[in-house]
Amino acid sequence: MERVRDLASEKAAVIFTKSSCCMCHSIKTLFYELGASPAIHELDKDPQGPDMERALFRVFGSNPAVPAVFVGGRYVGSAKDVISFHVDGSLKQMLKASNAIWL
């Protein structure tokens, strides 16, 4: 979990994904459309990916474990959570507050 914590804090917005995950692609696209440039960690392309995926599942309980979204170093949630935050307008506010976007 330490590696996940370190990576989750490296930028204002961080998304743990898998390259074959359609919801991961959707969340990445949403962030790009909002003007954010998140750090993307493809767990299926990282040698430590399986360990990080297990840690994400164990700590946050999301199944599947990806996408796992962090804003300002804080776990925001999975795709369902992020979409809910986007719909109610709070995702953009989180991104602004963490300096992931400026407008």
Curated annotation (Swiss-Prot):
Residues 1-102 form the Glutaredoxin domain. Its main location: cytoplasm. The keyword Cytoplasm applies. Gene3D superfamilies: Glutaredoxin. It is found in: Cytoplasm. GO terms for biological process: negative regulation of transcription by RNA polymerase II. GO terms for cellular component: cytoplasm. SUPFAM superfamilies: Thioredoxin-like (SSF52833). Keywords: Cytoplasm, Disulfide bond, Electron transport, Redox-active center, Transport. Disulfide bonds join C21-C24. PANTHER family: GLUTAREDOXIN (PTHR10168). NCBIfam families: GlrX-like_plant. Belongs to the glutaredoxin family. CC-type subfamily. Has a glutathione-disulfide oxidoreductase activity in the presence of NADPH and glutathione reductase. Reduces low molecular weight disulfides and proteins. This is Putative glutaredoxin-C12.
